[in-house]
Amino acid sequence: MKLSCMLIEWALYVCPAVLLATQMSLAASLETLKCEGPVSTEHSSCLAATEEDEGDDDMARSGEADFRFKGYTFSKPFHLIVSYDWLILQGPATSIFEGDTLVLHCRAWQDWPLTQVIFYREGSALGPPGSKSEFSIAVARKSDSGHYHCSGIFRSPGPGSQETASPVAITVQELFAAPVLKALPSSGPQEGGSVTLSCETKLSLQRSASRLLFSFYKDGRSLSSRGISSEFRIPEASEEHSGSYWCEAATEDRQISKQSPELEIRVQALQKPATPETPPPAKAPGPLPLLPTPSDEQPVFSFSDPYLTYRINRLLRQMQDVRILLGHLVMELRNLSAHRKPATTKS
């Protein structure tokens, strides 16, 4: 399949591998746009038809850059900006992701030599003045995003005064999201069951071809280091596997690595089947408490009629004797009940 280029007004659709151009160019600079291969240049366009896709009316995207439409393959857009300033800051022409090298160029009118060059981010100088017109960050991070500009003094035949370039917004895109550790089937597995830890993250669509390596940790101790699998399996969980787990996803060159939040796993012990409780053996009955005995004391009732007094007091003494006998009977029944309970439970 042959790649193609198309120039439409200010938007330039190019083949990144063969185009010699910059994101921002000075009006007096000489830039070369080159489109290789058998092409058609009708209507100031640079196109290349694909042999196998001619006549295809549907648009199909492939990869991060090019797409096909009606038999033609196009690269992603390239925006060319022409400036008439004395000094410009030239940023990267393609998207910058975490781990990439970020290179900035401070370019003067007609590439006149500069001195006392300073690069800035968000208005703060990134270093002392120098003669180098290039600034680079070997491993870009998201925190390196911001507005950059540069300043410098022209050597002859320039104006001789310090010039400052307009700010350029630089965005370092996230290569992959911070991972999240998940436990399947749950973070509270039963003892003896299996547990699978999954370190979940996703690469940026434009860098989906990159490969990540995964590591797993428990309580600060490494369980698995830099493997291609995003899962770690515990075949038979026990109480020893309870603890704090986390995972790490990293690029192959280890330039970018991110850790997941900790996940607390508590293995639940197996519950033993409930057994019927055996009642404690009944205590042997102790001696019966002393009960009052019939009293021969004279009753306290007294009437004017001696015979009535005699009959009333005798009746009261008989009632007292009955009460004492009933008390003895109740105690006997309690003792008998205490002896019969264990036999009833066993049966």
Curated annotation (Swiss-Prot):
This protein's record includes keyword Signal: yes
Q: Where is this protein chiefly located?
A: cytoplasm
Q: What is this protein called?
A: Fc receptor-like A
Which N-terminal stretch is annotated as signal sequence? 1-27
The organism of origin for this protein: Rattus norvegicus (Rat)
GO terms for MF: transmembrane signaling receptor activity
Q: Which PROSITE patterns match?
A: IG_LIKE
Gene name of the record: Fcrla
* GO cellular component terms attached to this protein's record: cytoplasm; external side of plasma membrane
